[in-house]
Structure formats: C-alpha cells, structure tokens
Amino acid sequence: MSKTRAVIPGSFDPITYGHLDIIERSADRFDEIHVCVLKNSSKGGTFDSEERMTLIEESVKHLPNIQVHHFNGLLVDFCDQVGAKTIIRGLRAVSDFEYELRLTSMNKKLNSNIETMYMMTSANYSFISSSIVKEVAAYQADISPFVPPHVERALKKKFNV
C-alpha cells in the first residue's frame, strides 16, 4: 500500500500554536506531512525562508512524519514533486473560507488530481494569526500563549526586545 502524503502550505511568519494545532492533528491522519513555506507576494516577511524553516523544524521535532521545505512556485507543482494528493488548509473563522475557496478552485483547475482538506483550528487558537502575534511582540507584550518558546525568543531578537 502506498503512503498517504499531504502538504500543509503557509507563510509561517512565524509559526504559531494555531499552525501547530493543524500540523499535529494532520500528522495523525497521514503517513507523511510536508510543511511547505511559501512566499506570499502580498505579505512582507519578518523572517526569511530559512529562518521560518528552522523555527518550524524545532516546533515539529516531536513528530517523526513531518518534513519541512520551502518552495517558490505553484503549490500544485510542489505537491507533484513530493507525491502528495492532498493539501491541508487551516480555517480560523468563516471569514477565512471565501479566500480559501478561491485558492482551492484555482489549484483544482491547475491540477485536478489534488484535493484540499479544510481543518478548523481548535477554538482556543482561532484568534491567533502570525500578523497579530508580531504586532503584540513589537509592543513587548507577552506572546507566550501564542507561540512556542523558541519562536518567542526569535521574535524578541528580531524586534530588539
């Protein structure tokens, strides 16, 4: 029987407990999870791709079936490259769905063999976004409930806090 593989894409700038919630729950459902750091042309980055990958790798080291990559191209091409037929997308709120539906429709047009699976973020993480975490960190407030300790340290270093 062939391995089941899925891709979890995102900018992960930085990874949060909300991201980890989706990754950990997905790791129980697939043989391999490929976390893919994508460059979002509409977002400026705080961390470069290598830094993001390092933060993710540290965050998922307890999960043996996770591989972390970065990719500068179409997500469906990355899926083909790693042999994944499923894209996993986390939803925090209903407001995320409209954007995600457009992405899913485009991916389906580009590669009809790829399916997208949506997972609702656990309620206690549904308000967390990387952007909000960075904003709070810049004001030197406590971000420990939102990100792993090593991510908190990296953000403090970035913001000279």
Swiss-Prot record:
Disulfide bonds: none annotated. Substrate binds at residues 11, 43, 75, 89. Homohexamer. Its EC number is 2.7.7.3. Reversibly transfers an adenylyl group from ATP to 4'-phosphopantetheine, yielding dephospho-CoA (dPCoA) and pyrophosphate. It is an enzyme of class 2 (transferase). It is found in: Cytoplasm. HAMAP family: PPAT_bact (MF_00151). This is Phosphopantetheine adenylyltransferase. Pfam families: CTP_transf_like. Pathway: Cofactor biosynthesis; coenzyme A biosynthesis; CoA from (R)-pantothenate: step 4/5. It comes from Staphylococcus epidermidis (strain ATCC 35984 / DSM 28319 / BCRC 17069 / CCUG 31568 / BM 3577 / RP62A). GO terms for biological process: coenzyme A biosynthetic process.
